[in-house]
Amino acid sequence: MTKEEIKRLVDEVKTDVIAWRRHLHAHPELSFQEEKTAQFVYETLQSFGHLELSRPTKTSVMARLIGQQPGRVVAIRADMDALPIQEENTFEFASKNPGVMHACGHDGHTAMLLGTAKIFSQLRDDIRGEIRFLFQHAEELFPGGAEEMVQAGVMDGVDVVIGTHLWSPLERGKIGIVYGPMMAAPDRFFIRIIGKGGHGAMPHQTIDAIAIGAQVVTNLQHIVSRYVDPLEPLVLSVTQFVAGTAHNVLPGEVEIQGTVRTFDETLRRTVPQWMERIVKGITEAHGASYEFRFDYGYRPVINYDEGDPRHGGNGVRAVRRRGSGPLETEHGRRRFLRLFAKSARQLFLRRRGQCRKRHRLPAPPPALYD
């Protein structure tokens, strides 16, 4: 199979990919509810032939293409779920499901992987090893559907896993990549400060949970600035502080939530210990009590490093020839194949969709790409 023949197959599938993307965009489904989406993907894959299909979970799909010769096992993954956003567009393939929209490009990811599966199914005689096409459900919810799929065995025996995400800030025709650490582990924390409520005019009869919570928030910031080497990437953000229902009443409790982003596994396991030590010390000093919970999300995305002598195969060299641009390392804006890649090498790319303008994130509501 020559490059010209492959290009011909790519050109031939282009119309299908656009049609699939528009169908998916018009019929978005939320995380763990992707039943019609999964059925559409399954039936579309079934029409290609040569693929062994399965449903690892209720709303996910896996297709296996077994080559004619032995070789490595490569997995390619796309996400399928939409977001709880009301679409404001008026074009014919705008969302038909009120309050649900493909606002993050998962319709495009799914359509592209369908197109990839169709092309490879026509190249079966030239394939060595196995290709697994993984259509993941529930990427948007914490900790996501990847864990269920891994537990179902979709990654058993996989050597390399590949994924991509549409990224509007990129120039058209460019592929963005970071070798080594690319996206951080997105963990979250929950803190409840339990004091003693009372009238706002008699604070001496209370244990002021708001004042205690404010001290906790302030002191948590010292973890990044004073506990960790300045060259070590770490983000700790308090994103919610909930307390009280009346202007003249001091509440008995405060709830604090937020996120922690890390690349280093040792630091990742140490940060919650530091956090709880701070919370414990402050609450005990003021006669309050606390609850602390730290939920671990996906592992960090660490692309197989280009400096590794085992890396830099034909696929990566082809990407470079086509035109790739560096991306800044990110603290986990996207939750990708961290669980999928736990036991396999990974390569995660970004590419721009065919949108009319380059946008900085967060992306605007219009989904102007195909």
From Swiss-Prot:
Catalytic activity annotation: an N-acyl-L-amino acid + H2O = an L-alpha-amino acid + a carboxylate; an N-acetyl-L-cysteine-S-conjugate + H2O = an S-substituted L-cysteine + acetate
Entry coiled-coil feature ranges: none
Keyword list, A-Z: Cobalt, Hydrolase
InterPro entries cross-referenced by the UniProt entry: Amidohydrolase, Bact_exopeptidase_dim_dom, Peptidase_M20, Peptidase_M20_dimer
Cysteines engaged in disulfide bonds, as pairs: none
The organism's place on the tree of life at top rank: Bacteria
GO terms assigned for molecular function: aminoacylase activity
EC number: 3.5.1.14
Family per record: Belongs to the peptidase M20 family.
Protein name: N-acyl-L-amino acid amidohydrolase
Protein's gene: amaA
